[in-house]
Amino acid sequence: QPNSCRDLAGRKLLFSINKNNDLAWIREWAEFHAKIHGTDAVILVDNGSTRYEPAEILATLQAIPAIAHAAVPSWPYSFGPIDPAVRKDPYWARFLQIGSMSMILRRYGELCYGLLDTDIDELAGTHSGRSIYDLAHDSKGGLIVFRGTWIEATGPGARHRDFTHKLADPKAALSPQRKWALDPSRPWVRRLSVHPYWHWVQGRALFSKSMPEDALYWHFKGINTNWKAQRTAAPAGPVVEDARLAKTFAGLAP
């Protein structure tokens, strides 16, 4: 397979895996990160979508002026099962996730300015307004990790910006899964024993990780096909507006 790392040298890369997400969701996800963080390259692995062809996803991404490079590798293979017998890591058999993300790092991302890992239903932010890529680039070890907030499915909505409310209980609103951003220029990233996946980077160097208070992400229950859990159900308790998210959306063009 061809290696595109030189083509993406210096780029701020956003990546994820997709299956049957609305094209409007995909556009808003990419456009948000382009406007807020300076994303100018997107790699979206398509895992056998049946609603459209990979070329339609690519056209959606290429229609965003700020995205200088986009690719949609087609991986129509089994995502992998959950193994309940392995309590410590029941997701160990999800080989497509680990394999595809290692492919993104090695075939596209090694020379990028930064890599950002968020799913289609997740938007990254910072309290200060700084780019998440700059936080990773300026960090001591090159890898920043951050947690998020669940944004509730409070009604019908076509895009992320249609949802801005979270549960009033801070503990219930916490999305515990960790997301990350990486400066791939760090020497430890060159080791082939380093394997990124959704919530971690396996084989990372000791002390390479930091968790800056400035970084966060929003996890949208209303932007979901319910493939994993029934997330689009009504909120389980009282909700309040996430002021920072609402302010961020207010600064974007309609």
Question: Where are each of the predicted segments found?
Answer:
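Catalytic-site signature of metal-activated, phosphate-bearing donor transferases
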Residues: Q1, T126-P254
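N-proximal low-complexity "stem/linker" segments adjacent to membrane-targeting elements
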Residues: Q1-R27
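Active-site-proximal specificity loops/subdomain of glycosyltransferases
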Residues: K12-L13, T50-G114
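An acidic- and aromatic-residue-enriched active-site/binding cleft used to recognize and process polar
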Residues: K19, G38-T39, N47-T50, W75-S78, ...
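A short acidic (Asp/Glu
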Residues: W25-E28, Y52-I57, D83-P84, T126-R130, ...
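Short, hydrophobic/aromatic alpha-helical segments in well-folded domains
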Residues: E28-F32, S100-M103, D119, S131-I132
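Short, acidic, metal-binding catalytic loop of nucleotide-sugar glycosyltransferases
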Residues: E31-D40
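Short beta-strand-to-loop acidic/aromatic patch adjacent to the donor-nucleotide binding site
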Residues: L44, I104, L111-G125
